[in-house]
Amino acid sequence: MAKKKGNLGSSTIAQNKKARFEYHIDETFEAGLSLAGWEVKSLRAGKAQLTDTYILIKNGEAWLLGSHITPLNTVSTHVVADPSRTRKLLLHRKEIAKIFSRTQDKGHTCVPLKLYWKKNLVKCELALVRGKKLHDKRATEKARDWNREKARIMRAH
């Protein structure tokens, strides 16, 4: 019997770390992405950024706006590659309706948290979020610093 390949590394392609700091996460969803061939090759090379990215629901479809996938030099020689084009998210109708209704509420939006591989498919973890106030951000940072300090103390003893 042939052995299965182990996990050769992390399946995460890109993370939106800023989103976890700037927003309260209410609910998360998993969506597929509709990509071109050169984009998949670039994602395998880890050339993706999710900072300042958001999700727009238009005409019953979900779109990923502001994401940046840098094309490789060896790929897309005959196709003009647009690194920041809008990409379609593949979700169920009920999920799209839920996201649309929640984003209509004041102070709510939908942002991607990370891109990752699931078998051989690219998936996007997205979340319905509410913006944090400045004092919430300070409290989050203070709690994170205290947890780090506790870990240092525990390691020392």
Swiss-Prot record:
Please name the SUPFAM superfamilies in this protein's record: Small protein B (SmpB)
Q: Which CDD domains match?
A: SmpB
Q: Which InterPro entries match?
A: SmpB, SsrA-bd_prot, SsrA-bd_prot_CS
User: Which region is the signal sequence?
Assistant: none
Q: Which UniProt keywords apply?
A: Cytoplasm, RNA-binding
Its main subcellular localisation, reduced to a broad class, is cytoplasm
Example of a GO cellular component annotation carried by this entry: cytosol
Output this protein's name. SsrA-binding protein
User: Function, please?
Assistant: Required for rescue of stalled ribosomes mediated by trans-translation. Binds to transfer-messenger RNA (tmRNA), required for stable association of tmRNA with ribosomes. tmRNA and SmpB together mimic tRNA shape, replacing the anticodon stem-loop with SmpB. tmRNA is encoded by the ssrA gene; the 2 termini fold to resemble tRNA(Ala) and it encodes a 'tag peptide', a short internal open reading frame. During trans-translation Ala-aminoacylated tmRNA acts like a tRNA, entering the A-site of stalled ribosomes, displacing the stalled mRNA.
Tell me the compartments it is located in. Answer: Cytoplasm
Q: Which family does it belong to?
A: Belongs to the SmpB family.
PANTHER family per UniProt? SSRA-BINDING PROTEIN (PTHR30308:SF2), TMRNA-BINDING COMPONENT OF TRANS-TRANSLATION TAGGING COMPLEX (PTHR30308)
Q: Which PROSITE patterns match?
A: SSRP (PS01317)
Question: Which GO terms of the molecular function aspect are on file?
Answer: RNA binding
GO terms for biological process? trans-translation
Entry-linked Pfam families: SmpB
